[in-house]
Protein backbone atom coordinates (compact mmCIF):
# COMPACT_ATOMS: atom_id res chain seq x y z
CA UNK A 1 0.00 0.00 0.00
CA UNK A 2 2.79 2.38 0.96
CA UNK A 3 4.76 1.44 -2.16
CA UNK A 4 1.74 2.10 -4.39
CA UNK A 5 1.11 5.47 -2.75
CA UNK A 6 4.75 6.50 -3.12
CA UNK A 7 4.78 5.40 -6.74
CA UNK A 8 1.66 7.42 -7.48
CA UNK A 9 3.14 10.44 -5.71
CA UNK A 10 6.35 10.16 -7.71
CA UNK A 11 4.42 9.90 -10.97
CA UNK A 12 2.28 12.87 -9.96
CA UNK A 13 5.34 14.99 -9.15
CA UNK A 14 7.02 13.99 -12.41
CA UNK A 15 3.90 14.93 -14.34
CA UNK A 16 3.76 18.29 -12.56
CA UNK A 17 7.42 19.09 -13.32
CA UNK A 18 6.95 18.02 -16.92
CA UNK A 19 3.84 20.19 -17.20
CA UNK A 20 5.59 23.19 -15.66
CA UNK A 21 8.54 22.93 -18.05
CA UNK A 22 6.79 22.11 -21.31
CA UNK A 23 6.48 24.85 -23.94
CA UNK A 24 3.23 26.73 -24.30
CA UNK A 25 0.50 25.13 -26.36
CA UNK A 26 -0.39 26.25 -29.85
CA UNK A 27 -3.26 28.70 -30.17
CA UNK A 28 -6.33 27.69 -32.15
CA UNK A 29 -7.16 31.33 -32.90
CA UNK A 30 -3.62 32.09 -34.06
CA UNK A 31 -3.56 29.01 -36.30
CA UNK A 32 -6.87 30.13 -37.80
CA UNK A 33 -5.53 33.63 -38.46
CA UNK A 34 -2.49 32.17 -40.22
CA UNK A 35 -4.77 29.97 -42.32
CA UNK A 36 -6.65 33.02 -43.67
CA UNK A 37 -4.08 35.26 -45.38
CA UNK A 38 -4.97 38.28 -47.47
CA UNK A 39 -5.78 37.41 -51.13
CA UNK A 40 -2.46 38.73 -52.44
CA UNK A 41 0.83 37.02 -53.40
CA UNK A 42 2.67 36.09 -50.20
CA UNK A 43 6.38 36.94 -50.31
CA UNK A 44 7.48 36.78 -46.68
CA UNK A 45 6.84 37.47 -43.04
CA UNK A 46 7.83 40.29 -40.74
CA UNK A 47 11.14 39.61 -39.04
CA UNK A 48 10.61 40.07 -35.31
CA UNK A 49 13.34 41.48 -33.08
CA UNK A 50 13.90 40.90 -29.38
CA UNK A 51 14.11 43.82 -26.96
CA UNK A 52 17.45 45.62 -26.74
CA UNK A 53 18.47 48.23 -24.15
CA UNK A 54 20.51 50.10 -26.76
CA UNK A 55 17.56 50.58 -29.11
CA UNK A 56 15.09 53.43 -28.46
CA UNK A 57 11.43 52.51 -28.78
CA UNK A 58 7.93 53.92 -28.93
CA UNK A 59 6.58 50.83 -27.19
CA UNK A 60 6.10 49.50 -23.68
CA UNK A 61 4.29 46.53 -22.17
CA UNK A 62 2.55 46.27 -18.82
CA UNK A 63 4.04 44.15 -16.04
CA UNK A 64 1.62 45.55 -13.47
CA UNK A 65 -0.08 44.25 -10.30
CA UNK A 66 2.81 42.08 -9.13
CA UNK A 67 2.88 44.25 -6.01
CA UNK A 68 -0.40 42.50 -5.12
CA UNK A 69 0.60 39.08 -6.49
CA UNK A 70 -2.04 39.07 -9.24
CA UNK A 71 0.77 37.91 -11.56
CA UNK A 72 4.21 36.43 -10.97
CA UNK A 73 7.26 37.62 -12.89
CA UNK A 74 9.14 34.32 -12.86
CA UNK A 75 6.29 32.61 -14.69
CA UNK A 76 6.21 34.89 -17.73
CA UNK A 77 9.45 36.89 -17.80
CA UNK A 78 11.06 34.88 -20.61
CA UNK A 79 8.39 36.15 -23.00
CA UNK A 80 8.84 39.87 -22.29
CA UNK A 81 11.86 40.43 -24.58
CA UNK A 82 10.17 38.45 -27.35
CA UNK A 83 7.62 41.27 -27.66
CA UNK A 84 10.36 43.61 -28.88
CA UNK A 85 9.26 46.49 -26.62
CA UNK A 86 11.75 48.96 -25.22
CA UNK A 87 10.07 49.46 -21.85
CA UNK A 88 7.93 47.70 -19.26
CA UNK A 89 5.69 49.29 -16.64
CA UNK A 90 5.98 48.12 -13.03
CA UNK A 91 4.09 49.11 -9.89
CA UNK A 92 6.16 49.82 -6.80
CA UNK A 93 3.87 48.45 -4.10
CA UNK A 94 4.44 50.57 -1.00
CA UNK A 95 2.30 48.17 1.04
CA UNK A 96 4.33 45.16 -0.07
CA UNK A 97 7.70 46.84 0.40
CA UNK A 98 7.15 48.44 3.83
CA UNK A 99 5.17 45.98 5.93
CA UNK A 100 6.78 47.26 9.12
CA UNK A 101 7.23 50.98 9.66
CA UNK A 102 10.62 52.16 8.44
CA UNK A 103 11.73 48.70 7.24
CA UNK A 104 11.91 48.32 3.46
CA UNK A 105 12.00 44.89 1.83
CA UNK A 106 13.00 45.45 -1.79
CA UNK A 107 14.03 41.93 -2.77
CA UNK A 108 10.80 41.21 -4.63
CA UNK A 109 11.03 44.47 -6.60
CA UNK A 110 14.76 44.03 -7.27
CA UNK A 111 13.92 40.80 -9.08
CA UNK A 112 11.57 42.67 -11.41
CA UNK A 113 13.75 45.73 -12.05
CA UNK A 114 17.01 43.83 -12.50
CA UNK A 115 15.25 41.00 -14.31
CA UNK A 116 13.84 43.32 -16.97
CA UNK A 117 17.21 44.99 -17.51
CA UNK A 118 18.86 41.59 -17.93
CA UNK A 119 16.24 40.80 -20.56
CA UNK A 120 16.99 43.99 -22.50
CA UNK A 121 13.94 45.96 -21.34
CA UNK A 122 14.01 49.33 -19.55
CA UNK A 123 11.74 49.39 -16.47
CA UNK A 124 9.58 52.39 -15.64
CA UNK A 125 7.68 52.45 -12.38
CA UNK A 126 4.32 53.61 -11.11
CA UNK A 127 4.63 54.69 -7.47
CA UNK A 128 1.48 53.48 -5.70
CA UNK A 129 -0.71 52.83 -3.59
CA UNK A 130 -1.40 53.47 0.11
CA UNK A 131 -0.05 51.42 3.02
CA UNK A 132 -2.21 49.84 5.77
CA UNK A 133 0.58 50.16 8.36
CA UNK A 134 0.02 53.92 8.17
CA UNK A 135 -3.64 54.36 7.24
CA UNK A 136 -6.80 52.84 5.83
CA UNK A 137 -6.61 54.83 2.58
CA UNK A 138 -6.31 51.56 0.66
CA UNK A 139 -3.54 49.62 -1.06
CA UNK A 140 -5.26 48.78 -4.35
CA UNK A 141 -6.86 50.45 -7.35
CA UNK A 142 -9.50 52.27 -5.31
CA UNK A 143 -6.96 53.67 -2.82
CA UNK A 144 -7.67 57.22 -1.69
CA UNK A 145 -5.12 60.01 -1.85
CA UNK A 146 -3.84 61.53 1.38
CA UNK A 147 -3.04 65.13 2.41
CA UNK A 148 0.08 66.50 4.09
CA UNK A 149 0.76 64.94 7.46
CA UNK A 150 2.29 61.76 8.91
CA UNK A 151 1.10 59.54 6.04
CA UNK A 152 2.57 61.88 3.43
CA UNK A 153 5.83 62.08 5.38
CA UNK A 154 6.10 58.27 5.40
CA UNK A 155 5.28 58.20 1.69
CA UNK A 156 8.02 60.69 0.87
CA UNK A 157 10.57 58.65 2.82
CA UNK A 158 9.51 55.58 0.88
CA UNK A 159 9.73 57.41 -2.45
CA UNK A 160 13.25 58.58 -1.68
CA UNK A 161 14.27 55.05 -0.75
CA UNK A 162 12.92 53.75 -4.07
CA UNK A 163 14.61 56.51 -6.08
CA UNK A 164 17.92 55.92 -4.34
CA UNK A 165 17.81 52.15 -4.83
CA UNK A 166 16.94 52.25 -8.52
CA UNK A 167 18.89 55.33 -9.63
CA UNK A 168 20.29 54.61 -13.07
CA UNK A 169 17.97 51.62 -13.53
CA UNK A 170 14.41 52.94 -13.63
CA UNK A 171 13.98 55.33 -16.56
CA UNK A 172 10.80 57.08 -15.38
CA UNK A 173 8.59 57.31 -12.30
CA UNK A 174 4.85 57.71 -12.60
CA UNK A 175 3.15 59.26 -9.58
CA UNK A 176 0.14 57.13 -8.58
CA UNK A 177 -2.26 55.15 -10.74
CA UNK A 178 -5.69 56.36 -11.81
CA UNK A 179 -6.34 58.91 -9.05
CA UNK A 180 -9.58 59.76 -10.85
CA UNK A 181 -10.84 56.19 -10.64
CA UNK A 182 -14.56 55.83 -9.88
CA UNK A 183 -15.57 58.04 -6.93
CA UNK A 184 -12.33 60.02 -6.70
CA UNK A 185 -13.21 62.58 -9.37
CA UNK A 186 -12.94 65.50 -6.93
CA UNK A 187 -9.45 64.60 -5.67
CA UNK A 188 -7.48 66.67 -8.18
CA UNK A 189 -6.19 69.14 -5.57
CA UNK A 190 -4.98 66.30 -3.37
CA UNK A 191 -3.32 64.80 -6.42
CA UNK A 192 -1.60 68.05 -7.39
CA UNK A 193 -0.07 68.29 -3.91
CA UNK A 194 0.95 64.61 -3.91
CA UNK A 195 2.55 64.94 -7.34
CA UNK A 196 4.63 68.01 -6.55
CA UNK A 197 5.87 66.68 -3.22
CA UNK A 198 6.67 63.29 -4.74
CA UNK A 199 8.37 64.74 -7.82
CA UNK A 200 10.57 67.01 -5.71
CA UNK A 201 11.61 64.03 -3.59
CA UNK A 202 12.48 62.00 -6.70
CA UNK A 203 14.52 64.78 -8.32
CA UNK A 204 16.37 65.39 -5.07
CA UNK A 205 17.74 61.85 -5.39
CA UNK A 206 17.82 61.39 -9.18
CA UNK A 207 17.93 64.68 -11.13
CA UNK A 208 18.03 62.94 -14.53
CA UNK A 209 15.10 60.52 -14.28
CA UNK A 210 11.87 61.30 -16.14
CA UNK A 211 8.65 61.90 -14.17
CA UNK A 212 5.12 61.20 -15.33
CA UNK A 213 1.90 62.57 -13.86
CA UNK A 214 -1.66 61.34 -13.45
CA UNK A 215 -2.19 57.96 -15.19
CA UNK A 216 -5.72 59.24 -15.70
CA UNK A 217 -8.56 56.91 -16.59
CA UNK A 218 -11.43 59.41 -16.74
CA UNK A 219 -12.97 59.97 -20.18
CA UNK A 220 -13.32 63.63 -19.21
CA UNK A 221 -10.47 66.12 -19.58
CA UNK A 222 -11.67 68.04 -16.53
CA UNK A 223 -9.77 66.00 -13.95
CA UNK A 224 -6.49 66.21 -15.85
CA UNK A 225 -6.76 69.94 -16.43
CA UNK A 226 -7.81 70.70 -12.83
CA UNK A 227 -4.89 68.65 -11.52
CA UNK A 228 -2.41 70.25 -13.93
CA UNK A 229 -3.55 73.73 -12.94
CA UNK A 230 -3.03 72.76 -9.30
CA UNK A 231 0.45 71.47 -10.14
CA UNK A 232 1.21 74.71 -12.00
CA UNK A 233 0.04 76.82 -9.05
CA UNK A 234 2.53 74.93 -6.88
CA UNK A 235 5.35 75.50 -9.38
CA UNK A 236 5.46 71.83 -10.29
CA UNK A 237 5.16 71.73 -14.09
CA UNK A 238 8.97 71.70 -14.41
CA UNK A 239 8.91 68.17 -12.97
CA UNK A 240 6.23 66.95 -15.34
CA UNK A 241 7.94 65.36 -18.35
CA UNK A 242 4.86 63.33 -19.29
CA UNK A 243 1.17 63.08 -18.52
CA UNK A 244 -0.15 59.56 -18.95
CA UNK A 245 -3.70 58.62 -19.79
CA UNK A 246 -5.43 55.23 -20.03
CA UNK A 247 -7.56 54.98 -23.17
CA UNK A 248 -10.16 52.26 -22.67
CA UNK A 249 -12.74 53.05 -25.37
CA UNK A 250 -14.74 50.38 -27.28
CA UNK A 251 -13.90 52.08 -30.60
CA UNK A 252 -10.24 53.15 -30.30
CA UNK A 253 -10.56 55.90 -32.91
CA UNK A 254 -13.10 57.71 -30.70
CA UNK A 255 -10.23 58.85 -28.48
CA UNK A 256 -8.64 60.99 -31.19
CA UNK A 257 -10.87 64.03 -30.67
CA UNK A 258 -10.41 63.79 -26.89
CA UNK A 259 -6.62 63.51 -27.01
CA UNK A 260 -6.13 66.25 -29.60
CA UNK A 261 -8.26 68.65 -27.58
CA UNK A 262 -6.39 67.69 -24.41
CA UNK A 263 -3.09 68.51 -26.16
CA UNK A 264 -4.35 71.95 -27.10
CA UNK A 265 -5.53 72.70 -23.57
CA UNK A 266 -2.31 71.44 -22.00
CA UNK A 267 -0.21 73.63 -24.29
CA UNK A 268 -1.51 76.70 -22.46
CA UNK A 269 -0.55 75.43 -18.99
CA UNK A 270 2.28 72.92 -19.46
CA UNK A 271 3.69 73.45 -22.97
CA UNK A 272 6.78 71.30 -22.38
CA UNK A 273 4.88 68.24 -21.16
CA UNK A 274 4.28 65.33 -23.54
CA UNK A 275 1.40 62.87 -23.55
CA UNK A 276 1.89 59.15 -23.03
CA UNK A 277 -0.69 56.40 -23.48
CA UNK A 278 0.38 54.57 -20.33
CA UNK A 279 -2.03 51.65 -20.05
CA UNK A 280 -4.69 50.18 -22.24
CA UNK A 281 -5.70 46.91 -23.79
CA UNK A 282 -8.66 44.76 -24.67
CA UNK A 283 -10.05 41.68 -22.91
CA UNK A 284 -10.17 38.34 -24.72
CA UNK A 285 -13.58 37.35 -23.35
CA UNK A 286 -16.82 38.97 -22.23
CA UNK A 287 -15.88 40.24 -18.77
CA UNK A 288 -18.10 41.32 -15.89
CA UNK A 289 -15.61 43.68 -14.27
CA UNK A 290 -12.82 46.14 -15.10
CA UNK A 291 -12.42 48.20 -18.26
CA UNK A 292 -14.36 47.38 -21.44
CA UNK A 293 -16.59 44.92 -19.60
CA UNK A 294 -19.99 44.04 -21.02
CA UNK A 295 -18.80 43.58 -24.62
CA UNK A 296 -18.60 40.20 -26.36
CA UNK A 297 -14.85 40.19 -26.91
CA UNK A 298 -12.88 37.22 -28.19
CA UNK A 299 -9.23 36.74 -29.19
CA UNK A 300 -9.80 37.92 -32.77
CA UNK A 301 -11.46 41.13 -31.64
CA UNK A 302 -8.88 41.60 -28.90
CA UNK A 303 -5.93 41.50 -31.31
CA UNK A 304 -7.65 43.80 -33.80
CA UNK A 305 -8.59 46.27 -31.05
CA UNK A 306 -5.06 46.41 -29.65
CA UNK A 307 -3.52 46.92 -33.09
CA UNK A 308 -5.94 49.72 -33.89
CA UNK A 309 -5.31 51.35 -30.53
CA UNK A 310 -1.53 51.17 -30.95
CA UNK A 311 -1.69 52.86 -34.36
CA UNK A 312 -4.24 55.44 -33.18
CA UNK A 313 -2.13 56.75 -30.31
CA UNK A 314 1.20 56.38 -32.09
CA UNK A 315 -0.45 58.25 -34.96
CA UNK A 316 -0.88 61.21 -32.59
CA UNK A 317 2.80 61.04 -31.68
CA UNK A 318 2.33 59.46 -28.25
CA UNK A 319 4.47 56.62 -26.83
CA UNK A 320 2.33 53.62 -25.93
CA UNK A 321 2.17 50.92 -23.26
CA UNK A 322 0.00 47.87 -23.95
CA UNK A 323 -1.86 46.23 -21.08
CA UNK A 324 -0.68 43.63 -20.19
CA UNK A 325 1.85 40.77 -20.45
CA UNK A 326 -0.24 38.08 -18.80
CA UNK A 327 -3.72 37.36 -17.50
CA UNK A 328 -4.18 38.62 -13.95
CA UNK A 329 -5.77 36.66 -11.11
CA UNK A 330 -7.68 39.09 -8.91
CA UNK A 331 -9.15 36.29 -6.82
CA UNK A 332 -12.71 37.16 -7.76
CA UNK A 333 -11.94 36.95 -11.50
CA UNK A 334 -9.24 36.15 -14.04
CA UNK A 335 -8.70 39.27 -16.10
CA UNK A 336 -8.13 38.34 -19.75
CA UNK A 337 -6.16 41.31 -21.12
CA UNK A 338 -2.91 39.32 -21.30
CA UNK A 339 -0.70 38.84 -24.31
CA UNK A 340 -0.31 35.42 -22.72
CA UNK A 341 -3.25 33.27 -21.67
CA UNK A 342 -2.65 31.81 -18.22
CA UNK A 343 -4.22 29.17 -16.01
CA UNK A 344 -5.36 29.64 -12.41
CA UNK A 345 -1.77 29.17 -11.20
CA UNK A 346 -0.58 32.03 -13.40
CA UNK A 347 1.30 29.67 -15.71
CA UNK A 348 1.36 30.42 -19.45
CA UNK A 349 -0.97 28.24 -21.51
CA UNK A 350 -0.46 29.81 -24.94
CA UNK A 351 0.50 33.05 -26.65
CA UNK A 352 -2.57 34.92 -27.82
CA UNK A 353 -2.76 36.51 -31.29
CA UNK A 354 -2.35 39.81 -29.42
CA UNK A 355 1.20 38.72 -28.50
CA UNK A 356 2.14 38.27 -32.16
CA UNK A 357 0.39 41.52 -33.09
CA UNK A 358 2.56 43.44 -30.62
CA UNK A 359 5.67 41.74 -32.02
CA UNK A 360 4.69 42.87 -35.51
CA UNK A 361 4.19 46.50 -34.48
CA UNK A 362 7.47 46.76 -32.56
CA UNK A 363 9.34 45.20 -35.48
CA UNK A 364 7.95 47.51 -38.14
CA UNK A 365 7.31 50.78 -36.28
CA UNK A 366 10.76 51.50 -34.91
CA UNK A 367 11.87 54.67 -33.15
CA UNK A 368 13.14 56.26 -36.37
CA UNK A 369 9.73 56.00 -38.03
CA UNK A 370 7.29 58.78 -37.21
CA UNK A 371 3.61 59.44 -37.93
CA UNK A 372 2.67 62.09 -40.44
CA UNK A 373 -0.68 63.57 -41.43
CA UNK A 374 0.61 64.19 -44.96
CA UNK A 375 -1.20 61.06 -46.19
CA UNK A 376 -4.95 60.62 -46.64
CA UNK A 377 -7.29 58.36 -48.57
CA UNK A 378 -10.39 58.71 -50.73
CA UNK A 379 -12.87 55.90 -51.30
CA UNK A 380 -16.55 55.35 -51.99
CA UNK A 381 -16.64 52.01 -50.17
CA UNK A 382 -19.14 53.23 -47.56
CA UNK A 383 -16.82 52.61 -44.60
CA UNK A 384 -14.67 55.09 -42.69
CA UNK A 385 -11.04 54.32 -43.56
CA UNK A 386 -8.57 55.45 -40.96
CA UNK A 387 -5.16 56.42 -42.29
CA UNK A 388 -1.84 57.13 -40.55
CA UNK A 389 1.13 58.19 -42.67
CA UNK A 390 4.62 56.82 -41.98
CA UNK A 391 7.71 58.99 -42.30
CA UNK A 392 11.44 58.29 -41.98
CA UNK A 393 14.24 60.85 -42.27
CA UNK A 394 11.72 63.42 -43.47
CA UNK A 395 10.47 61.16 -46.27
CA UNK A 396 7.00 59.61 -46.50
CA UNK A 397 7.51 55.84 -46.82
CA UNK A 398 4.01 54.42 -46.44
CA UNK A 399 0.76 54.44 -44.52
CA UNK A 400 -1.40 52.29 -42.25
CA UNK A 401 -5.02 51.75 -43.29
CA UNK A 402 -8.06 50.12 -41.70
CA UNK A 403 -11.80 50.43 -41.19
CA UNK A 404 -12.09 52.44 -37.98
CA UNK A 405 -15.78 53.23 -37.61
CA UNK A 406 -16.97 50.30 -35.45
CA UNK A 407 -15.96 47.94 -32.69
CA UNK A 408 -13.83 45.24 -34.32
CA UNK A 409 -15.58 42.02 -35.25
CA UNK A 410 -14.40 38.39 -35.29
CA UNK A 411 -14.37 37.93 -39.05
CA UNK A 412 -11.15 37.10 -40.91
CA UNK A 413 -12.63 38.18 -44.25
CA UNK A 414 -11.35 41.29 -46.03
CA UNK A 415 -13.34 43.58 -48.27
CA UNK A 416 -11.91 44.37 -51.70
CA UNK A 417 -12.17 48.13 -52.20
CA UNK A 418 -10.99 50.76 -54.64
CA UNK A 419 -9.23 53.76 -53.15
CA UNK A 420 -6.96 56.67 -53.89
CA UNK A 421 -4.03 57.42 -51.59
CA UNK A 422 -2.89 61.05 -51.48
CA UNK A 423 0.52 62.04 -50.19
CA UNK A 424 2.43 58.98 -51.45
CA UNK A 425 4.47 59.02 -54.63
CA UNK A 426 5.46 55.36 -54.62
CA UNK A 427 3.66 53.70 -57.51
CA UNK A 428 6.88 52.97 -59.43
CA UNK A 429 8.60 51.59 -56.37
CA UNK A 430 8.42 48.15 -54.80
CA UNK A 431 5.38 48.50 -52.59
CA UNK A 432 4.31 45.73 -50.25
CA UNK A 433 1.21 45.06 -48.17
CA UNK A 434 1.93 44.17 -44.54
CA UNK A 435 -0.83 42.43 -42.58
CA UNK A 436 -0.15 43.68 -39.05
CA UNK A 437 -2.13 40.85 -37.46
CA UNK A 438 -0.49 37.83 -39.09
CA UNK A 439 2.78 39.56 -39.97
CA UNK A 440 2.44 38.35 -43.57
CA UNK A 441 4.08 40.49 -46.25
CA UNK A 442 2.37 40.48 -49.65
CA UNK A 443 3.39 41.84 -53.03
CA UNK A 444 1.37 44.67 -54.56
CA UNK A 445 2.97 44.54 -58.00
CA UNK A 446 -0.14 43.15 -59.71
CA UNK A 447 -2.43 45.62 -57.94
CA UNK A 448 -1.11 48.47 -60.11
CA UNK A 449 -1.34 46.91 -63.56
CA UNK A 450 -3.03 49.35 -65.87
CA UNK A 451 -3.00 52.09 -63.27
CA UNK A 452 -0.42 54.85 -63.02
CA UNK A 453 -0.02 57.90 -60.86
CA UNK A 454 -3.33 59.75 -60.91
CA UNK A 455 -1.57 63.00 -60.15
CA UNK A 456 1.69 64.04 -58.57
CA UNK A 457 1.98 62.56 -55.08
CA UNK A 458 -1.08 60.32 -55.37
CA UNK A 459 -2.11 56.99 -56.82
CA UNK A 460 -5.10 54.71 -57.08
CA UNK A 461 -5.46 51.02 -56.28
CA UNK A 462 -8.41 49.33 -58.02
CA UNK A 463 -8.78 46.44 -55.59
CA UNK A 464 -7.16 46.42 -52.16
CA UNK A 465 -8.20 44.01 -49.39
CA UNK A 466 -9.05 46.00 -46.25
CA UNK A 467 -10.69 45.11 -42.94
CA UNK A 468 -11.16 46.42 -39.41
CA UNK A 469 -7.50 45.83 -38.54
CA UNK A 470 -4.43 47.81 -39.66
CA UNK A 471 -2.52 46.92 -42.80
CA UNK A 472 0.54 48.87 -43.88
CA UNK A 473 1.32 49.89 -47.47
CA UNK A 474 5.06 50.51 -47.51
CA UNK A 475 8.19 50.54 -49.62
CA UNK A 476 9.73 47.08 -49.30
CA UNK A 477 13.11 48.67 -48.54
CA UNK A 478 11.87 49.59 -45.05
CA UNK A 479 10.23 46.27 -44.16
CA UNK A 480 12.33 43.80 -42.12
CA UNK A 481 11.23 40.43 -43.43
CA UNK A 482 12.03 36.77 -43.79
CA UNK A 483 11.38 35.59 -47.33
CA UNK A 484 8.74 32.95 -47.93
Regions found by a protein language model. Give the residues of each.
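C-terminal beta-strand-rich structural cap/linker in extracellular carbohydrate-active enzymes
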Residues: 443-484
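Solvent-exposed beta-hairpin/edge-strand motifs
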Residues: 420-441
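Aromatic/acidic polysaccharide-binding cleft in carbohydrate-active enzymes
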Residues: 282-363, 372-383
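Mature N-terminal, pre-catalytic/accessory segment of carbohydrate-active enzymes
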Residues: 19-78, 83, 478-484
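Substrate-binding cleft and catalytic face of glycoside hydrolase catalytic domains
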Residues: 80-240, 247-250
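Carbohydrate-binding surface patches
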Residues: 378-427, 465, 470, 478
